[in-house]
Regions:
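C-terminal and late-domain segments of enzyme folds
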Residues: 20-66, 88, 168, 172-328
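ATP/NTP phosphate-donor binding region
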Residues: 52-56, 63-112
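Catalytic-core regions built around general acid/base machinery
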Residues: 113-116, 136-150
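Sec/Tat signal peptide C-region and signal peptidase I cleavage site
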Residues: 15-19
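Sec-dependent N-terminal signal peptides
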Residues: 4-13
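Glycine/threonine-rich flexible loop motifs
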Residues: 127-137
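Catalytic nucleophile loop
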Residues: 123-124, 146-166
Length: 328
């Protein structure tokens, strides 16, 4: 009886510890532990996935006044921490915040961590997690507040959520160009809007991995759906290839860094045929392609040093006005 009583007392004593819950988020930080408040400037990075582009992170660190650099993601690890710290040795700190649920996104500690960041990077992953977990939470609110005066960027899924119109990828797999041209309302094409409030990216839908994964056809379907949703009568798209990043300053002027190209699509109006279970017809969508020697002005939608042409989908068949017929 005494032994049983002793065991019960031990269990009672341990109850608070057993009841203590693990935080719904995970946080890793390297560098200084104290907060700093340097002068910052706004800027947006749209990175096309694949190997990260060093120059893009260095640009962000400069705009952040070498303050606290924060990576946010829904899954994954802290692999960015040593990489960014090496690129930006003067940065006060580099941290990764994993926010895997709405509960985590509503945690006051998550909000406090984000509030103290001078630069925010949205890692690649699954953009449906970002829109499902973070929409309507302090994560979204603080992210948009930071966009107004701080550098913010994203790669792959992180790129997707920074444009006004978002391919939300709610299905189990991403849509391919062949699927999208054959049926622009196929179940893999899902969309949301207004997750991020970036002035230069209003009226635009974005796409990464562009050339590498042959996404021109699906981007025409994106534009058709944006118009069909009533979101824009002449929709626009920005697409960035892998190992490449578009750097947009606070005035809406963009340069490109990395190894490949970026594309700026302008539809002349709604698609001629944009219907469920029907091949897409969308004629004469304008394309401006730039490499690292070109620039782009989002205020007047014009590029310098660009190659300009049109692409069309006719009954689901993609064609281009370029010599040789390449869509890219």
């Amino acid at each position: 009886m005494k032994r049983l009583l002793a065991l019960l007392l031990v269990l009672v004593a341990c109850t608070p510890a057993l009841a203590a819950k693990k935080p719904p988020y995970t946080y890793f930080r390297v560098g200084n532990t104290g907060d700093v408040s340097p002068t910052t400037s706004p800027g947006i990075v749209l990175m096309g996935g694949g190997t990260d582009v060093d120059a893009a992170f260095q640009w962000m660190c400069g705009l952040a006044g070498n303050g606290d650099f924060l990576v946010i993601r829904a899954t994954g690890t802290d692999a960015y921490n040593p990489y960014i710290q090496e690129l930006c040795p003067a940065a006060n700190s580099v941290a990764t915040l994993i926010i895997p649920s709405a509960a985590a996104a509503n945690d006051p500690n998550v909000a406090a961590i984000m509030q103290n960041a001078e630069a925010i990077w949205i890692a690649g992953g699954d953009q449906s997690n970002y829109t499902n977990f973070w929409t309507g939470t302090p994560v979204q609110t603080i992210l948009n507040a930071k966009i107004a005066g701080h550098p913010v960027g994203g790669t792959s899924a992180g790129l997707n959520v920074l444009t006004q119109f978002v391919y939300s990828a709610l299905a189990a797999q991403g849509a391919t160009s062949s699927q999208s041209l054959a049926d622009p309302f196929n179940r893999y094409l899902t969309f949301v809007r207004d997750f991020a409030n970036v002035a230069s990216l209003v009226g635009i839908i974005g796409d990464p991995h562009f050339v590498t994964r042959d996404r021109m056809g699906r981007d025409l379907a994106f534009l058709c759906r944006v118009a069909a949703n009533g979101w824009s009568s002449a929709p626009r798209g920005v697409a960035v290839d892998e190992q490449t990043a578009l750097l947009i300053d606070g005035s809406g002027n963009a340069t490109l860094v990395g190894n490949s190209t970026a594309y700026f699509l302008q539809a002349p109006g709604p698609a001629q045929v944009c219907a469920a279970k029907t091949p897409l017809t969308y004629l004469n969508v304008g394309v401006q392609r730039i490499n690292t020697s070109g620039t782009f002005n989002f205020n007047n939608w014009t590029a310098t040093g660009s190659t300009n042409y049109t692409v069309s989908a006719n009954a689901g068949v993609l064609t281009s006005s370029q010599p040789g017929g390449s869509a890219y």
